[in-house]
Regions:
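Domain-scale selection of a single, long terminal region
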Residues: 1-4, 24-26
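Electrostatic cytochrome c docking/interface patches
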Residues: 19-52
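Short pre-active-site segment immediately N-terminal to redox-active cysteine/selenocysteine motifs
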Residues: 52-56, 64, 132
Length: 145
């Protein structure tokens, strides 16, 4: 039920229809190449992570964003993410966390295939655009221990 609520909230975000889908290649445990062909903006990525209407990351994760209260405790702390994973590994986790844990409650923010119970209005549309994914990856990569 929680997963359904998370996905429903994410699918209602305005960013959903903002981007054309771009192909990506998974190499082992990462997507090495940027989805946009350029680096993301860490400041925009931080804003996406903190925004409870766009990324909803803090619904489940805790992160080094002290001005945001009531952060989640269902998923790993985002602090130190840039020390634990490469940009490519972070990218794949945001694009499709199910690659690492098939029972995760984290929705695939960019994958649109093989999803269950998606309303027609949201079918074949990623939750975050390629640019937003790259911005989030750029921000998470700055979070070093």
């Amino acid at each position: 039920m929680l997963l359904g609520a998370i996905v429903a909230a994410l699918l209602a975000t305005p960013a959903l229809a903002a981007d054309v889908r771009r192909a990506y290649v998974v190499n082992g445990d990462e997507i090495k190449a940027s989805l946009t062909g350029r680096a993301g903006d860490p400041a925009r990525g931080r804003a996406i992570v903190a925004n409870r209407q766009v990324g909803l990351c803090l619904l489940c994760h805790t992160g080094p964003i002290p001005e945001e209260r009531f952060q989640g405790d269902l998923a790993p702390d985002l602090g130190g993410a840039g020390s634990r994973w490469t940009e490519g590994q972070l990218r794949l986790r945001v694009v499709d966390a199910e690659r690492f844990n098939p029972t995760t409650i984290m929705p695939p923010y960019f994958r649109t295939e093989k999803l269950a119970r998606v309303a027609k209005a949201f079918a074949d549309k990623p939750i975050l655009s390629a640019e937003q994914i790259e911005d989030v990856v750029a921000y998470l990569a700055t979070l070093k221990d």
